[in-house]
């Protein structure tokens, strides 16, 4: 048996669907009489192609009819309005699904947060964050709750620290409340009071009043920090400018009047013990600062000599005590505060820079000297002096040996000759063949390093002083000659001035020099003293901390061939080698200089680098000690581990322990430590 009431409702729904189908595709008409709310929701979802989830608590009958054709947006708003009338709301989800819940549950659901660009319309459930500039939200929120449906889906919450309102409800209601807030939130701090100070400093007064006002707000005051009165100092006229609400301005003005009183003393004196800076150098900086302060206070003027100035009716004096590295300053309180800030910013630990240089030099040289010399007893012959064994000298030394039996001449010739020499004679002819091949290799690696302060020049010098004859003078009374000797330093020199820039970059002004005494004298300078090999680089580079860059280098290759020969005879193929001397020399030299700066900003980094260097040096000592024989070498002294105290005698160790005990007793606030007699 079919229920007649239910059949009538189904017929009504069918008629409504037929009416909707007969309209345009984007227009709808609705007519529901005593229809179940679930059927109404399902019909709307089908027409709008929306998936709708219905909460189980959504139940009831509805009666509604639309006489006009509605477009899709109007139809959706009509749907929301009907649900609002019956105490329900729609919550859109991220995936496009709609959820129908009771209105009082909607405000705790994931409803969208809107703003001025898209505030929402109609009966959509939205949340709006409204900033308030001139009125306390604590006082405004209760008024708005009376205009909102707090029993349903509406809600008004205030947040004091940011002075904002969080309004939740139907979009039309929320927009109306936002408009109410805008009209109520009128600027109430346009009035300004200017207080001319007679004795106190405007800057110091503003700092004091601001701190007091801030403390009052943080202790639970009703006024938000955004609504607190604003206090600004006008240093030019030594005035305080106050703006805000009338009551707040009156309280600030009264406070300023009470503080702006004449002090009994015209100044005070303080002693600043510096931790890092040098008091004597800082005095000059503070004198310049005091000059600027006086110009600001008086509108121009000059300071008295010696760092004294008359500022604000009082004397300003700045001096340094070098024995304690302290500054003694006498000034008015406001000036003292400014100078104290300057001292605090100047007396800081300056960064240091570790500069490590690597100097690499590789040199190779090869030489070949071949020569044949002839002599005749009747006179004549060929002789080449570049062999360091001329045949004429050999003949004279041989004749001296044959006639007198002395070998002095031959010994002197042998001292200056290297290589092989072979000779023979037949009849009146004699021949001398000399041959010499040389090969030299040299690898030099130097790694000087130095630590210096930022913007402080430092130098490093390791080498020896070589005596060089600079002149000579004959005596007027005798035949003696007096030579003047100077000392020239040779070795490794490093002079550097680092400047730390922004972003851990270091500008290095570097002067690098590596010098040594040449093993081979330049031709024709044997009587003039030693010859020096010098490599110098003077440069300025910008390097990032920890990076290694090349400063400069040299790649040099020289090939030299010297031929001494008898004209015509020395040019004969093959046989010409018997009438000439050939000297071939080839040399190569590669020189590179690298640099690496490292910024040391704190003691931990400095200690870590020192520990690494110390440990590496100690490891070399241990390795050398392990390779030495206990029978041939005495026991090598090795450095203790890094951070470990050097062994002391028992008496010294006892005194150190007593000193540590006294320091510990003083730090713990105990009774003074007294050593008793035993």
Curated annotation (Swiss-Prot):
Gene3D superfamilies: 3.30.1370.120. It is found in: Cell outer membrane. Residues 189-264 are annotated as: N2. Residues 604-678 are annotated as: S domain. GO terms for cellular component: cell outer membrane; type II protein secretion system complex. One of its GO terms (biological process) is protein secretion by the type II secretion system. Keywords: Cell outer membrane, Membrane, Protein transport, Signal, Transmembrane, Transmembrane beta strand, Transport. Residues 26-122 are annotated as: N0. Residues 1-25 form the signal peptide. Residues 124-188 are annotated as: N1. Its main location: membrane. Residues 267-347 are annotated as: N3. The record marks 463 as: May serve as a pivot that allows opening of the central gate for substrate egress. It holds the Pfam family Secretin_N. InterPro entries: Bact_Secretion_Sys_Channel, GspD-like_N0, GspD/PilQ, NolW-like, NolW-like_sf, T2SS/T3SS_dom, T2SS_GspD, T2SS_GspD_CS. Disulfide bonds: none annotated. Belongs to the bacterial secretin family. GSP D subfamily. Forms a cylindrical channel with 15 subunits. Involved in a type II secretion system (T2SS, formerly general secretion pathway, GSP) for the export of proteins. This subunit forms the outer membrane channel. The N0, N1, N2 and N3 domains are periplasmic, while the secretin and S domains form a channel that is partially inserted in the outer membrane. The N1, N2 and N3 domains each form a periplasmic ring. The secretin domain forms a double beta-barrel structure; the outer barrel has a diameter of about 110 Angstroms while the inner barrel forms the central gate with a small pore in the closed state. This is Secretin ExeD. The lineage of its organism: Bacteria, Pseudomonadati, Pseudomonadota, Gammaproteobacteria, Aeromonadales.
């Amino acid at each position: 048996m079919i229920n007649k009431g239910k059949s009538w409702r189904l017929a009504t729904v069918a008629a409504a669907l037929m009416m909707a189908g007969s309209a345009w595709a984007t227009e709808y008409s609705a007519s529901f009489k005593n229809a179940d709310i679930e059927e109404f929701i399902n019909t709307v979802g089908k027409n709008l192609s929306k998936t709708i989830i219905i909460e189980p608590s959504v139940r009831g009958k509805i009666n509604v009819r639309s006489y006009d054709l509605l477009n899709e947006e109007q139809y959706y708003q009509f749907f929301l309005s009907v649900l609002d009338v019956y105490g329900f709301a729609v919550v859109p989800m991220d995936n496009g699904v709609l959820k129908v819940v009771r209105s009082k549950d909607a405000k705790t659901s994931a409803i969208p947060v809107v703003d001025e660009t898209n505030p929402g319309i109609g009966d959509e459930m939205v949340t709006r964050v409204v900033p308030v500039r001139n009125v306390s939200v604590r006082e405004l929120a209760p008024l708005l709750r009376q205009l909102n449906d707090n029993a349903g889906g509406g809600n008004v919450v205030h947040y004091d620290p940011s002075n904002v309102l969080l309004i939740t409800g139907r979009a039309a209601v929320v927009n109306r409340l936002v408009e109410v807030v805008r009209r109520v939130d009128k600027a109430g701090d346009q009035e300004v009071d200017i207080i001319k100070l007679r004795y106190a400093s405007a800057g110091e007064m503003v700092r004091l009043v601001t701190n007091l006002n801030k403390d009052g707000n943080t202790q639970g005051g009703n006024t938000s920090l955004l609504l607190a009165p604003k206090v600004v100092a006008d240093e030019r006229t030594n005035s305080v400018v106050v703006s805000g609400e009338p009551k707040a301005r009156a309280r600030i003005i009264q406070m300023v009047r009470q503080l702006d009183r004449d002090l009994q003393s015209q100044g005070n004196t303080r002693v600043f013990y510096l931790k890092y800076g040098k008091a004597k150098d800082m005095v000059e900086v503070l004198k310049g600062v005091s000059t600027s302060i006086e110009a600001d206070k008086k509108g121009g003027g000059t300071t008295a000599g010696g760092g004294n100035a008359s500022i604000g009716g009082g004397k300003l004096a700045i001096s340094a005590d070098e024995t304690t590295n302290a500054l003694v300053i006498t000034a008015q309180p406001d000036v003292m505060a400014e100078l104290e800030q300057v001292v605090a910013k100047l007396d800081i630990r300056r960064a240091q820079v570790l500069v490590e240089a690597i100097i690499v030099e590789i040199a190779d040289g090869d030489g070949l000297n071949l020569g044949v010399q002839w002599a005749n007893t009747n006179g004549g012959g060929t002789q080449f002096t570049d062999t360091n064994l001329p045949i004429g000298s050999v003949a004279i030394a041989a004749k001296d040996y044959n006639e007198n039996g002395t070998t002095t001449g031959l010994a002197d010739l042998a001292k200056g000759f290297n290589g092989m020499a072979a000779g023979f004679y037949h009849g009146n002819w004699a021949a001398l063949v000399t041959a010499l091949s040389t090969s030299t290799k040299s690898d030099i690696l130097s790694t000087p390093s130095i630590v210096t302060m930022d913007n402080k020049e430092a130098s490093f010098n390791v080498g020896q002083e070589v005596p060089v004859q600079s002149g000579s003078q004959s005596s007027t009374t005798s035949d003696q000659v007096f030579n003047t000797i100077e000392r020239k330093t040779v070795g490794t020199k490093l002079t550097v001035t680092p400047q730390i820039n922004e972003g851990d970059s270091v500008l290095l002004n570097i002067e690098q020099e590596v010098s040594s005494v040449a093993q081979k004298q330049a031709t024709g300078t044997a009587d003039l003293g030693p010859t020096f090999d010098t490599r110098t680089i003077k440069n300025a580079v910008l390097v990032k901390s920890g990076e290694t860059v090349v400063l400069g280098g040299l790649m040099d290759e020289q090939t030299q061939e010297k031929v001494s020969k008898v004209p015509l005879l020395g040019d004969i193929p093959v046989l010409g080698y018997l009438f000439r001397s050939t000297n071939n020399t080839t040399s190569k030299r590669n020189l590179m200089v690298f640099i690496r700066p490292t910024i040391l900003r704190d003691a931990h980094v400095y200690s870590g680098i020192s520990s690494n260097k110390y440990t590496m040096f100690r490891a070399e000592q241990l390795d050398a000690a392990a390779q030495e024989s206990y029978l041939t070498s005495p026991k090598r002294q090795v450095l203790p581990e890094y951070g470990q105290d050097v062994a002391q005698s028992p008496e010294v160790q006892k005194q150190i322990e007593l000193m540590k005990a006294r320091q510990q007793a003083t730090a713990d606030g105990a009774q003074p430590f007294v050593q008793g007699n035993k």
